[in-house]
């Protein structure tokens, strides 16, 4: 029997008198086939260390621990720590850290792996309410995670993996794809969770690029420009950029020159631009002193 078997999950929750906290976005997966697929998608073996976020009662952790060198799992809810000590008692390669992943010194914790030089993968069923902040925090941490295989709301997975000229494409697509390739591996129906969420989920596989997707003079400025370009999706690039940089004649003159230099029409919308085009635009705007 597995932790994720419905009868086992139910028994564990009852034995510990556990009640779900909506504020933590707790939805526990009760489908062993899907858990197996997640671990297979992540290609976990004994030459990999794993960071997990939000283990719940350890359903995914169990599958990871059977194959990984070590698993370090971060759980914000202190009530789950004794439950995890119970459900994962047979594993000596799992460390449970009762801290908020957004506040923890992750680089310091990683040094506690027995072999910290092994590749580190992030495999997790992320809390829906805080998926994007967690992802961006990890991606921008400077820690060289080799890949992420993470479950999230399908809509968010679609946005992250979206290509130009699609409805889902936006500043989040650019922010992630600058650092990583992103592809939806498979869909997870809402019916396999306790309690069932209101939406379907997706497993997103993201692999770190050896170098960022495009070369830019100023990364922070590049992200600001891409974000500003999607402020109002139905507005043109010109309208969004004047809304961000200002509408003085001097600014308009600089914008005109930058757009011309980048080979872009003022009437185009942000959703039509590729990462390379945003890079060219950001560098041209920077060159104009904006």
UniProtKB/Swiss-Prot annotation:
Protein EC: 2.1.1.182
Assigned GO CC terms: cytosol
Recorded catalytic activity of this chain's protein: adenosine(1518)/adenosine(1519) in 16S rRNA + 4 S-adenosyl-L-methionine = N(6)-dimethyladenosine(1518)/N(6)-dimethyladenosine(1519) in 16S rRNA + 4 S-adenosyl-L-homocysteine + 4 H(+)
Transmembrane segments: none
Primary localization: cytoplasm
Binding, S-adenosyl-L-methionine: 27, 29, 54, 75, 100, 125
Keyword annotations: Cytoplasm, Methyltransferase, RNA-binding, rRNA processing, S-adenosyl-L-methionine, Transferase
SUPFAM superfamilies: S-adenosyl-L-methionine-dependent methyltransferases (SSF53335)
Gene Ontology molecular function: 16S rRNA (adenine(1518)-N(6)/adenine(1519)-N(6))-dimethyltransferase activity; RNA binding
SMART domains: rADc
InterPro entries reported for this sequence: KsgA/Erm, rRNA_Ade_diMease-like_C, rRNA_Ade_Mease_Trfase_CS, rRNA_Ade_methylase_Trfase_N, rRNA_adenine_dimethylase, SAM-dependent_MTases_sf
Compartments, record wording: Cytoplasm
Claim: Transferase is one of the keywords in the record: yes
Domain of life: Bacteria
Family (UniProt): Belongs to the class I-like SAM-binding methyltransferase superfamily. rRNA adenine N(6)-methyltransferase family. RsmA subfamily.
PANTHER family found in the cross-reference section: DIMETHYLADENOSINE TRANSFERASE, DIMETHYLADENOSINE TRANSFERASE-RELATED
The protein's role, per its UniProt record: Specifically dimethylates two adjacent adenosines (A1518 and A1519) in the loop of a conserved hairpin near the 3'-end of 16S rRNA in the 30S particle. May play a critical role in biogenesis of 30S subunits.
Protein name: Ribosomal RNA small subunit methyltransferase A
Gene name linked to the record: rsmA
